Swiss-Prot record:
GO terms for biological process: NAD metabolic process; NADP biosynthetic process. It holds the Pfam family NAD_kinase_C. It is found in: Cytoplasm. It catalyses: NAD(+) + ATP = ADP + NADP(+) + H(+). Gene3D superfamilies: Probable inorganic polyphosphate/atp-NAD kinase, domain 1, Probable inorganic polyphosphate/atp-NAD kinase, domain 2. Involved in the regulation of the intracellular balance of NAD and NADP, and is a key enzyme in the biosynthesis of NADP. Catalyzes specifically the phosphorylation on 2'-hydroxyl of the adenosine moiety of NAD to yield NADP. InterPro entries: ATP-NAD_kinase_N (IPR017438), ATP-NAD_kinase_PpnK-typ_C (IPR017437), NAD/diacylglycerol_kinase_sf (IPR016064), NADK (IPR002504). This is NAD kinase. One of its GO terms (cellular component) is cytoplasm. Belongs to the NAD kinase family. The lineage of its organism: Bacteria, Pseudomonadati, Pseudomonadota, Betaproteobacteria, Burkholderiales. Its main location: cytoplasm. GO terms for molecular function: ATP binding; metal ion binding; NAD binding; NAD+ kinase activity.
């Protein structure tokens, strides 16, 4: 049950098909339950780790019943559950049990110390934006999806370049020949967009970035757009073209299909430990200051 801003029910979500994750999840569940919170598990997580004694709920049921979700996994786990819980405004606490951990900012070794503090009400809250996209074919929408990181239109690994026609707010911008085009949120600017030479956007920046993938013309550069922009990308030429959403779901495209992308009305609340710094995350994950003095240790 949800009661104002107080946390009563805590949902636990784990990374799928991950050896060794059952023990830390069970430990965390016991720790949280001892503090007097009701603990529930995401159903797939409960089934995979074989835990009993806690209710097992679908993401929709978690959204309706839980006050906060604690996610133990990598960024992909956080992206997946974040999209599903976004309509319910369920806050997320991310514990890194993956490789990179840009958005799962609590180390697994620190979870028993930090999660209870956050659940007691001591945290820094941050809202992250989402994209919503639909595919239009012959004037009719055929597919709809949310994206936390990015919407990516690209060729398959065995086809040549594609030609895409991009417009913003109904105004023609360009035709582009490339391997594809990324539409990324600020959160997604440190994902695929970054590897394609896109800029890093601070998560609180109100913007969306378009990043070409291996463009034929070097003058096709990334561009940051206002976050209320309505972006349309039409398939002009090419074969075996796909669109994917956070690299977790995709659909095949045909010539003249249009992908319409805009900011979603939903946001995803993140709860960070007190003292959280996005810049510290960048330093650590991108290996900035590796040859600096102890200045990095002093920074916060």
């Amino acid at each position: 049950m949800k009661t104002g801003n107080q946390f009563n029910t805590v949902a636990l979500v784990g990374r799928s098909n991950t050896p060794g994750i059952a023990e830390p999840l069970a430990t965390l569940a016991g720790c949280i339950a001892k503090l007097g919170f009701d603990v529930v598990f995401e159903a797939d997580t409960a089934r995979e780790i074989g835990i009993s004694g806690y209710p097992a709920l679908t993401p929709a049921e978690i959204g309706a019943r839980a006050d906060v979700a604690v996610v133990l996994g990598g960024d992909g786990t956080m992206l997946g559950i974040g999209r599903q819980l976004a309509p319910y405004k369920t806050p997320l606490i991310g514990i890194n049990h993956g490789r990179l951990g840009f958005i799962t900012d609590i180390a697994a070794a620190d979870m028993q110390a930090l999660v209870p503090v956050i659940l007691s009400g001591k945290f820094e809250r941050e809202e992250r934006s989402l994209l919503e996209a639909r595919i239009v074919r012959n004037g009719e929408p055929i597919y709809h999806a949310l994206a936390f990181n990015d919407v990516v239109v690209n060729r398959s690994g065995f086809s040549g370049m594609v030609e895409l026609r991009a417009s913003v707010d109904g105004r023609y911008m360009y035709n582009q020949r490339s391997d594809g085009l990324i539409v990324a949120t600020p959160t997604g600017s440190t994902a695929y967009a970054l590897s394609s030479a896109g800029p890093i956007l601070h998560p609180q920046l109100q913007g969306v970035v378009l990043v070409p993938i291996a463009p034929h013309a070097l003058s096709n550069r990334p561009i940051v757009l206002p976050d209320d922009s309505k972006i349309a990308i039409q398939i002009v030429a090419g074969r075996d073209v796909n669109v994917n959403f956070d690299m977790q779901s995709f659909t095949a495209l045909e010539l003249n299909d249009t992908i319409e992308v805009r900011r979603s009305k939903h946001t995803v609340p993140f709860l960070h430990p007190i003292g959280y710094s996005y810049y510290a995350t960048l330093r650590k994950k991108l290996h900035w200051n590796e040859h600096a003095s102890n200045e990095d240790d002093k920074a916060s």
